[in-house]
Amino acid sequence: AALGYAEALTRSSDPNDNRLGGELLRQLVRTDHSNIRVLSMYAFNAFEQQRFGEAVAAWEMMLKLLPANDTRRAVIERSIAQAMQHLSPQESK
């Protein structure tokens, strides 16, 4: 139920809802950092909120969990590259 609520908040047109959804997703990631769906939603929400370092960290966790032949890996790798372009040199280390 919490994941569905977080998803609804992140899709809202209200920036405050988006922020609350991101906080809820962050709590869900802390509780279960092996849930691909939670990590994916968290990463995309962080990216949309311009928290690029958090997005990269979540996507990197996903890559560790996915099998080498998983088709989602290419999309995640592109997303990481895109987020890295937004990071300052200090953040990308």
Language-model regions: role of each:
Residues A1-D32, M41:
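Alpha-helical adaptor scaffolds
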Residues S13-D17, Q49, T71:
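Short coil/turn and helix-start
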Residues R11-R19, I80-K93:
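Alpha-helical linker/edge segments of TPR/alpha-solenoid repeat scaffolds
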